[in-house]
A protein has these predicted regions:
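Serine/threonine-rich, repeat-prone extracellular segments and beta-strand-based repeat modules
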Residues: 2-41
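N-terminal, intrinsically disordered, polar/charged segments of Gram-positive cell-envelope systems
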Residues: 9-11, 49-53
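Interdomain boundary/hinge segments at the C-termini of tandem beta-sandwich modules
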Residues: 42-50
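Secondary-structure boundary elements
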Residues: 51-105
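Active-site nucleophilic cysteine motif
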Residues: 72-79, 109-124
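Hydrophobic/aromatic-rich core segments of domains that either
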Residues: 115-179
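Low-complexity, Gly/Ser/Thr/Pro-rich intrinsically disordered linker/tail segments
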Residues: 170-198
Length: 198
């Protein structure tokens, strides 16, 4: 028996972004060139975290917390405290699918800084507030938060609760950098990637 059998899986017919059942082939080849194959199928299911669902959930929340007569700052305040008050921190391994992260925050009310940030993104988008995602220069860990612009330039908007406390609602760059220096470089970011933060 060859302990170094090479195993490949042919998934060339799988369309990962389209729900369905697809054929796959396992191919094993030993050192002598003997080859064996086995056919199987792989089922791709539609994620509940699609863009339409996330937008719907975000609009439901916005409908409960935002009114037409609110100022831009009042809308930020309502979104900030909805996220802070409705999501509980729990480590999550997924840092790639923003829709899944936003869905987890809006539906299950738990997640890490990526979930807080992407839930905020979905709510800010639903409220018509200009925003972008910002992240730290990776040191010991990576942290995600938002930048927002309600007509006065870009400001920091970080809804993730911190053990040391703090409110990061419409925070200017000087203040967040001071906080960062005093808290293990929590918000060190590449200023060339995010120019013009107030």
């Amino acid at each position: 028996m060859d302990p170094n059998v090479k195993l490949d899986v042919d998934t060339s017919q799988v369309r990962q972004k389209e729900a369905g059942t697809y054929p796959i082939v396992y191919i094993a080849v030993d050192a002598s060139g003997n080859r064996a194959t086995a056919n199987a199928s792989l089922t791709v299911v539609k994620s509940a975290a699609d863009e339409e669902t996330v937008k719907k959930l975000a609009k439901e929340v916005i409908g409960q917390i935002i009114t037409d007569d609110m100022s831009g700052y009042d809308k930020l305040y309502a979104i900030y405290y909805w996220v802070r008050g409705n999501i509980r921190y729990q480590d999550q391994p997924n840092l790639e699918d923003w829709l899944k992260a936003a869905y987890d925050g809006l539906k299950y009310h738990q997640g890490d800084c990526y979930v807080y940030c992407m839930t905020s993104r979905a709510l800010l988008d639903a409220a018509g507030i200009k925003n972008m995602v910002i992240d730290t220069v990776p040191l010991r860990y990576i942290h995600f938060w938002n930048l927002v612009d309600i007509g006065e330039g870009w400001y920091h908007f970080d809804t993730t609760p911190r053990a040391s406390g703090g409110t990061f609602l419409y925070m200017n760059d000087a203040d967040i950098q001071e906080y960062s220096r005093n808290h293990q470089n929590s918000h060190i970011y590449d200023h060339d990637r995010f120019p013009g933060v107030q």
